[in-house]
Amino acid sequence: AHSLFTSGSALKPPTIDEVVKLAGVAKGTFYLYFKDKYELMDQLFLKKLAECVNSALFKTRQHFAGRQTDDAERVNTFLDNVFVYIEENKAFLPLVRDRVSSCYRMMLKGREAELKDAYGSLVKLFLAHGYTEYESEMNIYMLVSMLTSVSCDSAVHGEPYKLDEIKHGMQRLVNKLLANKEERDYDI
């Protein structure tokens, strides 16, 4: 089923008939496990998202093993590892496109331990930098939204900007978000 959702258009996901035919199961069996194809898409997305987060966390922890570093460097290294995963798993991107709200809800529900841990760590990080819990959660949502939407076109088509350019822009944004409170307070 994964190949059906990653090879087609995000605007026209495969039909239930296509899914059950490829999986070699009856429609009734499909409906025992999933309410509809969108629930299946959410499950596939959650699995790939957890794989991405787990891979990025593992590489980040390896990179900083036994070393002290500042929070911005740690988050930027994590984001670099997410970009590496995206670059190596482009087939996953059609599943990601337009699924930011689902991604955020899944992180909040914490159905996957990796997502729950990563989300909790990010909230604590922002709290330590003077943000309220509400502001911390909003910052995470904005980062996830930007990361997923801009990385899809950049990774698949190389436009309007290359993935490396997007990565550097995200790093600057993280550095600003994690700057001292006095440095980031501004009037709009």
What is each model feature region?
Residues 126-173, 184-188:
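Hydrophobic/aromatic-rich alpha-helical bundle segments in the mid-to-C-terminal region
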Residues 43, 58-87, 143:
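Hydrophobic alpha-helical connector segments
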Residues 1-5, 82:
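Short hydrophobic clusters on alpha-helical segments that form packing/core surfaces
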Residues 81-105, 123, 149-156:
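Amphipathic alpha-helical segments used for helix-helix packing
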Residues 13, 93-97, 135, 186-187:
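Short, hydrophobic secondary-structure boundary micro-motifs
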